[in-house]
Amino acid sequence: MEYRRLGHTDIDVSAICLGTMTWGQQNTEAEGPEQMDYAVEMGINFFDTAEMYAVPPMAETQGKTEKIIGTWFQKKNNRQDIILATKVAGRAPMDWLRDDGSGTEQTPAQIHEAVDKSLKRLQTDYIDLYQLHWPDRPIRIFGGLGHKEMGGEINKIEDILGALADIQKAGKVRHFGLSNETPWGIMKFLHHAEMDKDLPRMVSVQNAYNLLNRIYELGSSEIFHREGVGLLAYSPLAQGYLTGKYQGGAMPQGSRKQLFDRLQRYEVDGAEEVIDSYLDIAKKYELDASQLANQFVTTRDFVTSNIIGATSMDQLKLAVTSIDVELTEEILADIDKVHLRAPNLCP
């Protein structure tokens, strides 16, 4: 396993991060520990979760993922060996996360409540990386183009950072990161931390990045090189579409598409043809399509860690061992030809 520095911290994280969002929904409470055991055996020291998980978000399963991880920590007595990342929800009408029944947003009070609940579920007294799951301001996230307004007062970035500073001073969190964030948002958070040294500096951003969505390269990748804010890339397989399992209208039993029908981000016009082209590249070079897609993400120089997810051990093993796949200049050139023909179809 390869290890990379997390932003301007003294922490080295594995180039592959274990994603967990299906635990407690598609994956049972027994399957989560099996995945963690295998990940550690393969050298992975970085786990990512969120207060909202399992996915899709609902009151019945909220918090289950963190609880599975916390139980594993207590059984293994190895908390110190894992770099643990979790997230506080952004603005949404999810009225089951907060004690007062309000929807989620990133007020100081909600941030304090959220981190304390995560610590309890995770059975730990500190979190290594605490991330803002999505911005608390008008912005289009989780797919689509254009600007999207949302109602209500917007919590000021400096107030959010002030709350984060408080929980850091209390020893509850070591470092902070962003998620589903824009170049403007990343730089505003960095600017406030630069102007007020008492505010924490963001060390990472967790955004979608894959062969169908390379939007990150257009603005945010420069921030990595100039500011040291690393990308934690999620959805490297485009929610499974880059494996080819949904091609031609296929609907595998037990898949996320079959169970929840919420993957429309990767069903835009032209996407199936582009996916076919990437599948052809994998076939041409005798590679597994999922490993091609994963290793493309892992090997980008602005990626700190590739967040993989799996609902079976076979999927997990393919994802983890993708780090051993060599992508030659010829393979990368073929990938870029497809990308330039139809760039960023699924932002």
Describe every region a protein language model picked out.
Residues 135-337:
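Beta/alpha (TIM)-barrel catalytic core signal, keyed to glycine-rich beta->alpha loops juxtaposed to Asp/Glu
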Residues 15, 46, 126-129, 175, ...:
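Residues at the N-termini of beta-strands
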